[in-house]
Amino acid sequence: WPVKGRVIASFGPRSDSTHNEGINIAVPIGTEVLAAEQGTVAYAGSELKGYGNLILLRHEEGWVTAYAHNEEILVKRGDKVKRGQSIAKAGKTGTVDQPQVHFEVRQGQKPVDPLPHMEKL
């Protein structure tokens, strides 16, 4: 898991007709955010609206993981990271009202429910 905490929003349709493309995990500000698997930092910044400070990791076989709403980013584009490595400090940047990590797993461009994959971690 990228962080240990309480899942406050699950993958899938929301009551407001939008779709959560990941899960949201409530954690205290400053909690270490860990890479779910080894990979390369494809993006580390705050330009994507709503996500706040965001990290995208590219993994083997076209998999990508996303970690959003971070207080502080500890890696930069091109860095190689190991599974379990600290990549950020959790926060409440972007469009959220409480400290949390928004975590996505994608196969190529397609978002998939992270929970079945996290059971293996």
Language-model segments: what does each one mean?
Residues V7, G39, L57, G84, ...:
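Terminal peptide-recognition signature
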Residues W1-Y51:
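Surface-exposed, glycine-biased beta-strand/turn segments
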Residues G22-A26, N53-H59, H102-E104:
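Short, acidic/hydrophobic/Gly-rich beta-strand patch recurrent on exposed beta strands
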Residues G12-R14, P28-G30, Q38, S46-E47, ...:
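Solvent-exposed coil/turn segments that connect beta secondary-structure elements
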